[in-house]
Amino acid sequence: MLKEFQEFISKGNVMDLAVGVIIGAAFGKIVTSLVDDVIMPIFGAIFGGLDFNNYYIGLSSAVNATSLAEAKKQGAVFAYGSFITAVLNFLILAFIIFLMVKAVNNLRRRLEREKPAAPAAPPPADVALLTEIRDLLAKR
């Protein structure tokens, strides 16, 4: 069983998947930083200090803090601002992946168009012989 597992792990597809997951996780951190450190401050500047991360609704009367971190210490909160930020992260990541897949597909199509057509395979020997006999009979 250990040998079968080793064969499974060493197959190319599993290794490619593992590399993809690792790169995807790192890329997700880049997108999160892009949203938190670049896009959200721009929204904040345009809309007057907008920071979705601190948008919440206290689910008990004991919650009266001004920041989400303090509010979570006071009790249960509905942190819809964090959800909005997560949705923005997802949309940006999905759009970037869409652009990457589109570029790869365009490259594949271009390479297929540029590839010369393969020469036709020679006919089987029996078909060639029958064609030759037909041609000889046609000459008589």
Swiss-Prot record:
Alphabetically ordered keywords of this record? Cell inner membrane, Cell membrane, Ion channel, Ion transport, Membrane, Transmembrane, Transmembrane helix, Transport
Q: According to its record, what are the GO cellular component terms?
A: plasma membrane
What residues form the membrane-spanning segments? 8-28, 30-50, 81-101
Q: Does the keyword Transport apply?
A: yes
Q: Which domain of life is it from?
A: Bacteria
Q: What is its main location?
A: membrane
Any idea where this protein resides? Answer: Cell inner membrane
State the annotated membrane topology for this chain: Multi-pass membrane protein
Tagged with keyword NADP: no
InterPro entries in the record: Mechanosensitive_channel_CS, MS_channel, MSC/AndL, MscL_channel
Q: How does it assemble?
A: Homopentamer.
- Summarize the protein's role: Channel that opens in response to stretch forces in the membrane lipid bilayer. May participate in the regulation of osmotic pressure changes within the cell.
Q: Which PANTHER family match?
A: LARGE-CONDUCTANCE MECHANOSENSITIVE CHANNEL (PTHR30266:SF2), MECHANOSENSITIVE CHANNEL MSCL (PTHR30266)
Q: What's the protein name?
A: Large-conductance mechanosensitive channel 3
Naturally occurring in which organism (per UniProt): Mesorhizobium japonicum (strain LMG 29417 / CECT 9101 / MAFF 303099)
